[in-house]
């Protein structure tokens, strides 16, 4: 449902904005908060575009859904790149777009989003700015450092597997309900035609 997706995106965008500015102005951690806020602003603009250009549609097409979920992955990856990469505890949220897709989109689109998410995880593992201070004073053990992306990959695969399983069952039930509704609709039409024919015969 488009409205549900829009609302979830607003929750994410507002959460990002509050977190970035709380870390910068309340905790006084040092990082590029201006660029981080611009990335959040980009996310807000994409959501406004979703509201404006798709206002007459209750459901997004497969293609449109993929583009917006790709934007979500890109936007969050950029934020994580600015704030520590996979060491950032919020990196777990990178899994959400793909999991959301597994419930609502077809297998091909979901696999493509899993690949994009995996590439994003790999990139921000090796290329990123330092985690906002004062945590920069702590030197991470290299085994701990690399265990985080490994855990993310494992979670990505298993969560998507379970989500795909439940999503498939949900789609099967939905198709069955739609077929039942079609049959009932046709029966109503036949009853209506039969009534009209009987009325015509008696007239």
Please tell me what each predicted stretch does:
Residues 35-40, 141-152:
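Alpha-helical transmembrane segments of polytopic membrane proteins
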Residues 173-203:
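Conserved HAMP-HisKA connector
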